[in-house]
Amino acid sequence: MTITQVKIKKLENFSGSLPEYATEHSAGMDLIAANEQPITIKAAAIQLIPTGIAIALPDSFEAQIRPRSGLAVKHGITVANSPGTIDADYRGEIKVILINLGKEDFIIEKGMRIAQMIIAKYERILWEESSSLMETMRGSGGFGSTGV
């Protein structure tokens, strides 16, 4: 396995520990809330939550912000734009767009684990315009066409 080093900056509102893998085979690292005061996410509402960190990803890498399954199943808290994408050239604070799909208000306290961050490599492409596409068994069938 290749380990890529990524620079991370702790901002003034940072507290706690840097994102880290919970187990040897974890794909994501937990992101910690860095809000000064508790933030209430009302039922069916969205809030932007600071993390207190900024990163400098290498070229051809992105960070994906995804929900934590425990928050989703127990409280209906998820990432509104899942997965959120942090581009390699972004240097600002990483913030998480959380939405409360539950029926009760939910309070985000400083230091709470709010989301997961996955670092992934990607490739850029160049479009080749064509008047036809290669046929496949699936064809243009979508939205349940292969079974429900």
Curated annotation (Swiss-Prot):
Give GO terms: molecular function aspect only.
dUTP diphosphatase activity; magnesium ion binding
Q: Name one GO biological process term.
A: dUTP catabolic process
Q: In which pathway does it act?
A: Pyrimidine metabolism; dUMP biosynthesis; dUMP from dCTP (dUTP route): step 2/2
Q: Does the keyword Metal-binding apply?
A: yes
Report the EC code(s) recorded for this entry.
3.6.1.23
> Is Ligase among this UniProt entry's keywords?
no
At which positions is substrate bound?
R68, S69, G70, N81, T85, I86, D87, K95
Query: What domain of life does the UniProt record list for this protein's source?
Result: Bacteria
Q: Kindly state which reaction or reactions the protein catalyses.
A: dUTP + H2O = dUMP + diphosphate + H(+)
Q: Into which EC class is this enzyme placed?
A: hydrolase
Keywords for the protein's UniProt record, in alphabetical order: Hydrolase, Magnesium, Metal-binding, Nucleotide metabolism
Q: Which InterPro entries match?
A: dUTPase, dUTPase-like, dUTPase-like_sf, dUTPase_trimeric
* Required cofactor names: Mg(2+)
Pfam families in the cross-refs? dUTPase
Which SUPFAM superfamilies does the entry mention? Answer: dUTPase-like
**What does it do?**
This enzyme is involved in nucleotide metabolism: it produces dUMP, the immediate precursor of thymidine nucleotides and it decreases the intracellular concentration of dUTP so that uracil cannot be incorporated into DNA.
Family listed: Belongs to the dUTPase family.
**What's the protein name?**
Deoxyuridine 5'-triphosphate nucleotidohydrolase
Its lineage opens with: Bacteria, Pseudomonadati, Pseudomonadota, Alphaproteobacteria, Rickettsiales
Q: Which gene encodes it?
A: dut
